[in-house]
Amino acid sequence: MSWANESITGEFVLLGFSDQPWLEFPLFVVFLTSYIVTIFGNLNIILVSHLDPKLHTPMYFFLTNLSVIDLCYITCTVPQMLVNLRSIRKVISFGGCVVQLFMFLALGATECVLLPVMSFDRFVAICRPLHYSVIMHQRLCLQLAAVSWIIGFGNSVWLSILTLQLPRCGHYVIDHFLCEVPALLKLSCVDVTANEAELFFVSVFFHLTPLSLILTSYAFIARAILKIQSAEGRQKAFGTCSSHLIVVSLFYGTALSVYFLPPSPHSKNRRKMVPLFYGIIAPMLNPLIYTLRNKEVKDAFKRLIKRVFLSKN
């Protein structure tokens, strides 16, 4: 009997770190702070990119998509986590668990596809600067963004169905902070070897394949930067890519450590903490990285502030 047939209105217990209650208040403060900073930082990028004509370029169009992903990413997990950290009953409804599972998978896969798209944009800008406006035209940008979202959500539909159709035989205690596939597979009372193999295949496809494309793009970018004669030109070219490289390292580095590092005595806690990093900390750091390391964004934000104050006066 599937999850849906067993309990549509039931609840699931999210253990989190309930065996270490002294961690709950510090984690509540950290997650609440991260949530506020993430909301403000990503909304800032979305508004500035939309309102400032100088940022109406493919690079900032894709950055806006990344900010939307990060906003949704953190919103589908953190509010429920904050409630559970301050509650005696650490539960999530069946419907809430399904939504959280679906969105977490969809947004993670979408970001996996979008990051190599952003590296392709940087590749064209630096390696084919004279043809940039011809290659990265508006229609192509819209198509690339749409494909990223479609692939991400399509993958989520498939994995969610495969996970939710498994019988759980009355098991309802999830040893995690959130409803994630590996944690949910442990609730099943049947052999899940095939599901684990499918999850591994999907992880390889959505992590190693995009990462290989990104590294290939940056190999060509690095070669092109080294050919630039002026130090100022090299610095400017490197500056446009360094923020994206940091974001890529944070996202793929932590995600890969979950699925590809061999099991260890600390694997249980690692599987809990790493999703928190790429699902909460990374969305908070992304706008900070792009804002603090990007002169165009900082200048655009200053112009926006001036416009707001001038309009009030």
Curated annotation (Swiss-Prot):
Superkingdom: Eukaryota
A biological-process GO annotation: G protein-coupled receptor signaling pathway
Annotated Gene Ontology cellular component terms: membrane; plasma membrane
A Gene Ontology molecular function term of the record: olfactory receptor activity
Topological domain spans for side Cytoplasmic: 49-57, 119-143, 222-244, 293-313
Extracellular side: 1-27, 79-97, 165-200, 266-271
Keywords, comma-separated and alphabetical: Cell membrane, Disulfide bond, G-protein coupled receptor, Glycoprotein, Membrane, Olfaction, Receptor, Sensory transduction, Transducer, Transmembrane, Transmembrane helix
Transmembrane domains' residue ranges: 28-48, 58-78, 98-118, 144-164, 201-221, 245-265, 272-292
Glycosylation sites: 5
Bilayer topology term: Multi-pass membrane protein
Stored PROSITE patterns: G_PROTEIN_RECEP_F1_1, G_PROTEIN_RECEP_F1_2
Localization: Cell membrane
Pfam families: 7tm_4
Main localization, broad class: membrane
Disulfide bonds: 97-189
Similarity comment: Belongs to the G-protein coupled receptor 1 family.
PANTHER family recorded: OLFACTORY RECEPTOR (PTHR26453)
Protein's job: Odorant receptor.
Record's protein name: Olfactory receptor 2B6
Originating species: Mus musculus
This protein's encoding gene: Or2b6
